[in-house]
């Protein structure tokens, strides 16, 4: 049994659909500015807010994918670890964070999986929503980048996400997410498209 077959079996056993193979074309590496942000960060990142015009310009910009090679890099690992420390820091106490919120316009989110045992935080590179249900509901949302504000937002109650598998980023996988965790994903993936929850009011 070859390595790719084992990967497919593992993904299926985890309830994940292996969707396709992503060739590494050598594109999608971190820029020198992004590397500087990652390497200069202390224990946590500064979170950008809409109150600052320069921050807001970054928050409103669309994000791009990373190459499989970059997802395996030390810089990517450091970025993910610092994103996780940032979102879980007592000063933030969030349930999700997107890379644009710390100044890096790449399609990376960290989300707390309330739908999994132990409610772990997990990182999803090159993530996007490929399907959303017509079943909608309003729920309260806040945002680390929109301080001191909460609003009711209409969201789909079930979605399918597609992302690069961390251990084997050349593979795209799909996962069905429901309930509150689906809302978190929608909120964070909006950030990757330059959209804030206040735009949906």
Question: What do the PLM-derived regions correspond to, one by one?
Answer:
Residues 2-201:
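Positively charged
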